[in-house]
């Protein structure tokens, strides 16, 4: 199975979700000056920001990570967290990244996620990678 890459703000909601998920993952640094580069296909797990609009929905650190052509070429899907209080904009970062990178928006969960979200993502990630061609 390939990896997960995620970003979590100082609220640590996405980080807590990833810890509970228990799958191999790399964290995009909170400090914008620190950079990471991935070397295998990945699913991106990202929180949504901005309170409703498209502008500002994707964290700056994630934009910088995806602006690296090497990193962007390896993304295979996106999972987004958000807050249902934002209505239609709930999980908007997933929609934005899916459209801009041409990858499927696989799942969304609220804040730290529920046990059901953890179970769904574990199962969904496993099934997703099983469906992918081996040389992708």
Swiss-Prot record:
* GO MF annotation list: FMN binding
| GO BP terms, alphabetized | protein modification process
What is any Pfam family matched here?
Flavodoxin_NdrI
Superkingdom of this protein's organism: Bacteria
As for what it does, the entry says: Probably involved in ribonucleotide reductase function.
Instruction: Tell me the protein family, please.
Output: Belongs to the NrdI family.
| Protein name per its UniProtKB record | Protein NrdI
Organism of provenance: Citrobacter koseri (strain ATCC BAA-895 / CDC 4225-83 / SGSC4696)
């Amino acid at each position: 199975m390939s990896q997960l890459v995620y970003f979590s703000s100082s609220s640590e909601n996405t980080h807590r979700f990833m810890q509970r998920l228990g799958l191999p993952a790399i964290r995009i640094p909170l400090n914008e000056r620190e950079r990471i580069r991935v070397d295998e296909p990945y699913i991106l797990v990202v929180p949504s920001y901005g309170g409703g609009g498209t502008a500002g929905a994707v964290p700056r650190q994630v934009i910088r990570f995806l602006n690296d052509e090497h990193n962007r070429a390896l993304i295979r899907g996106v999972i987004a967290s958000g807050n249902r209080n934002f209505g239609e904009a709930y999980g908007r970062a997933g929609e934005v990244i899916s459209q801009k990178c041409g990858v499927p928006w696989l799942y969304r969960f609220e804040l730290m996620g529920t046990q059901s979200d953890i179970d769904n993502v574990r199962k969904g990630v496993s099934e997703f990678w099983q469906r992918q061609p081996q040389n992708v």
